[in-house]
Amino acid sequence: MGTFNEFVTRADALADETFTEYTVTKRRFEAAERKRAETPVKHGLVSAEYAVRAAKAEADYLEAREKYETVKRGLPEKSSQMAAIRADFVAAVASHFAADPAKLDKATLALLESGILKPGEYERLMASAEKDENFTMIRLIAAKAAEVADKAPTREGEAILKAVAMRGRNADGGDYIRAFDVGVASLFERCLRNPSLYSSWDMLMQPVRDAL
């Protein structure tokens, strides 16, 4: 389970609740609509048994229609609930990737300021910080690599340093937020607009579950 899977689980629960409620009420409304069409209320001479069935069919139809319309009117609120999940997710990402003085590695900082590091050594320092998920040091190493890249003695060294700098720029959690926006929030809105996608939610969400 990924670091931010809690928010995917919350989104899944909201989608399941929303799509199930909509699907069930729509199905019941359509069934009541068919029953009403089969036994319409008639004026004039009809049997008591038919009159009772027709009246019940009409009442069932009106009740099912009202429930269905209520569910449809409530869909914008579901969007608001997804927006709240996203807000919590963004806050969690910001906290996870925030610079933390407690994570400063003074020995590595001294090396970065010494001027003796070769491009490959920047790369090794970055790999070590990434392994430790030390985002404070990742960003510091990246910033220093970007600062010295243009001074590299070779084009190969410059390319290595720029690659290290790029890895640090991606260590702010932005990729996670973009993945949630596209793979969760936007997908949910598309499903709300197009109920035929409801049954595909699990399949379409799987890549995001794996990523987060």
Task: Identify the function of each model-found stretch.
Residues N5-V8, T20, E30, V90, ...:
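Compositionally biased, low-structure terminal segments
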